[in-house]
Swiss-Prot record:
A motif (COPI vesicle coat-binding) lies at residues 194-201. It is a single-pass type I membrane protein. This is Transmembrane emp24 domain-containing protein 2. InterPro entries: Emp24-like, GOLD_dom, GOLD_dom_sf. It comes from Rattus norvegicus (Rat).
């Protein structure tokens, strides 16, 4: 019989396979991250550009044989899942080479699934329904975590847009007030001079 402590340790181990990061990528720079996996392992990349420029980044996933698995240009966010076609180190790169001066902040998560099991272990796993339920729960919790991180980044982006719009509206209002005061003073001065009585000596 599996104890509650063993279940919690198994759940924590399953959740530990997904790591979320924030990375700053300078203009004309590229940042790469590497994961070593066995053939058949399911992998996934979820990313979102949080700050910088037009919120776009170039993304590339390369296999151990330097074969391109995925390439995206000027993407703001994305999700890509694939199965490793061979044993080795897979490379996940974010490139900001198209930007002339703006650094980008990218939030990303690389999900690494479980390595495929042998035939004997697979039948044993089917017999253990509790382990399957824990795996499903771990996947669901990871999905909720990713969605929460995504919403947090979107909220930060929208707050920055709102703050920027608010500051522009306030500055424009001050400018309009100054123009209104200047026009009022000009009209008072003009009317005052218009009604002045000029004396001829």
């Amino acid at each position: 019989m599996v104890t509650l402590a063993e279940l919690l340790v198994l759940l924590a181990a399953l959740l530990a396979t997904a790591s979320g990061y924030f990375v700053s990528i300078d203009a004309h720079a590229e940042e790469c991250f590497f994961e070593r996996v066995t053939s058949g392992t399911k992998m996934g990349l979820i990313f979102e550009v949080a700050e910088g420029g037009f919120l776009d980044i170039d993304v590339e996933i390369t296999g151990p044989d330097n074969k391109g698995i995925y390439k995206g240009d000027r993407e703001s966010s994305g999700k890509y899942t694939f199965a490793a076609h061979m044993d080795g180190t897979y490379k996940f790169c974010f490139s900001n080479r198209m930007s002339t001066m703006t650094p980008k902040i990218v939030m990303f998560t690389i999900d690494i699934g479980e390595a495929p099991k042998g035939q004997d272990m697979e039948t044993e796993a089917h017999q253990n329904k509790l382990e399957e339920m824990i795996n499903e729960l771990a996947v669901a919790m990871t999905a909720v975590k990713h969605e929460q991180e995504y919403m947090e980044v979107r909220e930060r982006i929208h707050r920055a847009i709102n703050d920027n719009t608010n500051s522009r509206v306030v500055l424009w209002s001050f400018f309009e007030a100054l123009v209104l005061v200047a026009m009022t003073l000009g009209q008072i001065y003009y009317l005052k001079r218009f009604f002045e009585v000029r004396r001829v000596v």
